[in-house]
């Protein structure tokens, strides 16, 4: 039994390393595309935000990308929404009001606001710039902090309902919002507020 457990653990580690390397390569390519978009549309060419919903939800898939350094300077878990049959493994995307789905596309990151629910909590306003997310402002789509671990939980998945993982109570509560851990949110706000130009967020799969 012990030998079997060791072999399974080794296989999972190998799988993680292999998929991790391929994912980082894809991230580099996405960052190059993002830089061109930022140049053409007047966004910051120092930083952008990237979310890859094509990745396993137990892995980091939210990134602050530093164009000057050519690498992410912050990365963390990011929950997707639960609407229209979305599961922990596979999100469903929609731009419809009332769909409670995540939306793909480019966003302009706006000001930080104080939410009424949960009362007093801060969040960053998002403006959808594509046909796939044009209703973002009407839907109240935000970047906001929630109870998520500060570390990857792969091969476990982030559930779309309240659940516990490694003793951490996970409450994604996303109805389309980009939800990240509390401790990582402050770094995002700091990056947004220190920029002389608006930041672009790109959500893709």
How should these model regions be labeled?
Residues 1-9:
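N-terminal Sec-pathway targeting helices
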Residues 10-18:
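Hydrophobic alpha-helical membrane-insertion segments, chiefly the h-region
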Residues 20-176, 182-205:
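Cell wall/extracellular polymer interaction/catalysis modules
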């Amino acid at each position: 039994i012990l030998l079997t457990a060791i072999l399974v653990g080794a296989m999972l580690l190998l799988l993680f390393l292999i998929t991790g390397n391929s994912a980082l390569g894809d991230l580099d390519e996405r960052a190059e595309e993002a830089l061109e978009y930022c140049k053409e549309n007047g966004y910051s060419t120092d930083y952008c935000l990237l979310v890859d919903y094509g990745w396993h939800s137990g892995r980091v898939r939210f990134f602050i990308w530093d164009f000057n350094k050519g690498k992410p300077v912050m990365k963390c878990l990011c929950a997707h929404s639960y609407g229209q049959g979305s599961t922990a493994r596979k999100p469903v995307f929609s731009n419809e009001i009332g769909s409670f789905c995540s939306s793909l596309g480019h966003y302009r990151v706006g000001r930080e606001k104080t939410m009424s629910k949960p009362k007093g909590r801060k969040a960053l306003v998002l403006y959808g710039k594509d046909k796939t997310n044009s209703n973002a402002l009407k839907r109240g789509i935000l970047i906001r902090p929630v109870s998520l671990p500060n570390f990857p939980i792969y091969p476990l998945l982030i559930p779309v309902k309240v659940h516990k993982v490694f003793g951490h109570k996970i409450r994604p509560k996303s109805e389309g919002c980009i939800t990240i851990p509390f401790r990582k949110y402050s770094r995002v706000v700091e990056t947004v507020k220190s920029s002389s130009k608006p930041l672009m967020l790109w959500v893709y799969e």
